[in-house]
Regions:
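Class I S-adenosyl-L-methionine
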Residues: 1-86, 90
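Conserved SAM-binding strand-loop segment of SAM-dependent methyltransferases
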Residues: 89-97
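Core SAM-dependent methyltransferase catalytic element
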Residues: 204-216
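Local beta-strand N-terminus motif with an aromatic residue
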Residues: 47, 107-108, 187, 207
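A short acidic, Gly/Pro-enriched loop at the edge of an enzyme's catalytic core
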Residues: 102-112
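Mobile active-site "lid"/loop adjacent to the S-adenosyl-L-methionine
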Residues: 115-146
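Amphipathic alpha-helical repeat scaffolds
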Residues: 12, 112-118, 163
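Conserved Class I SAM-dependent methyltransferase catalytic core
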Residues: 75-77, 138-198, 209-211
Length: 216
C-alpha cells in the first residue's frame, strides 16, 4: 500500500481509514449479492436511481444492469479509490453516508447495501438537531442510523434492502427504531441469514436481510 501512496501522509491516512472500517464492516459474499438482486428483480423492482450507502468495492452495483444513475458512498479511503477505478460511470463519494446532501432526500428508487453495524456513533447535524427522539437516538448505533437515513433518501414507494445485524430485529433497545420503521414503511421481507455467512471474513455474526418499501 505504501508504494501506491503519493507520500507518507497519504499512506498513514489509508492505514487509519482501514483500521476504522475494520470495526464495523464485513464485506459481502458474492452468492448473497446474487440472491438479493435476483429477488429484487422478481419483485418487479427496476430502479432508475440506485444508492449504495456503504459500497465497499462494489459487489452490489456489479450486478446492476441498465440503471441510468448509480450513487455510492464508501468511507474507507483506499476502498473508495478502488471502487472509483472499477466503476468510473458511477457517482462515488469517498466519505461517510452522513455527508449526503439534502438534495437527495426523496430521490432514489432503491437503496441497497451490506451496511456497517455496531455501537459506533455517527454525527449528522440534521439528526442531532431533530425533535424526533428516534432520529436523534439512532446516531448512537451506525446500523440504526443507516436505516433512517436510507429511508429519507427514498421517494414514496421506493425499496430499501439491507443486510444488517440481527440486533435490529431482536434487541429490546432497538424497539423504537423498529416502531419508527413500521410507521414509515411496509415490510416486504425479513430473512435470518446463516451465522457462518461471513466466515471468509474471519468472523461469525448473526445477520438479517431486511427489505422495506417506503410508505409515509
Amino acid at each position: 500500500m505504501r508504494e501506491y501512496s503519493k507520500d507518507e501522509t497519504e499512506y498513514k491516512a489509508y492505514v487509519q481509514s482501514l483500521k476504522k472500517s475494520a470495526l464495523t464492516a464485513f464485506y459481502t459474499p458474492e452468492p448473497l449479492v446474487a440472491a438479493m438482486q435476483e429477488s429484487l428483480q422478481v419483485s418487479g423492482s427496476h430502479p432508475g436511481r440506485f444508492l449504495d450507502p456503504s459500497a465497499g468495492t462494489g459487489m452490489f452495483i456489479s450486478r446492476l444492469k441498465d440503471v441510468p444513475e448509480i450513487h455510492c458512498f464508501e468511507k474507507d479511503k483506499l476502498t473508495g479509490k478502488i471502487l472509483s477505478s472499477l466503476y468510473p460511470e458511477s457517482r462515488v463519494t469517498i466519505d461517510g453516508f452522513q455527508s449526503i446532501q439534502p438534495y437527495y432526500n426523496n430521490y432514489f428508487d432503491m437503496v441497497s447495501s451490506n451496511i456497517p453495524f455496531g455501537n459506533t456513533r455517527v454525527y449528522d447535524r440534521d439528526f442531532d438537531r431533530s425533535e424526533d427522539v428516534v432520529r436523534k437516538s439512532s446516531l448512537a448505533a451506525v446500523h440504526n442510523y443507516f436505516f433512517l437515513k436510507g429511508m429519507d433518501t427514498l421517494h414514496e414507494g421506493g425499496i430499501l434492502a439491507y443486510i444488517t445485524t440481527s440486533g435490529v430485529m431482536d434487541s429490546p433497545q432497538n424497539r423504537p427504531v423498529r416502531e419508527w420503521l413500521v410507521n414509515h414503511a411496509n415490510l416486504v421481507s425479513a430473512i435470518r441469514l446463516p451465522d457462518n455467512l461471513f466466515v471468509d471474513a474471519g468472523t461469525e455474526v448473526s445477520s438479517d436481510l431486511i427489505v422495506l418499501q417506503k410508505n409515509t
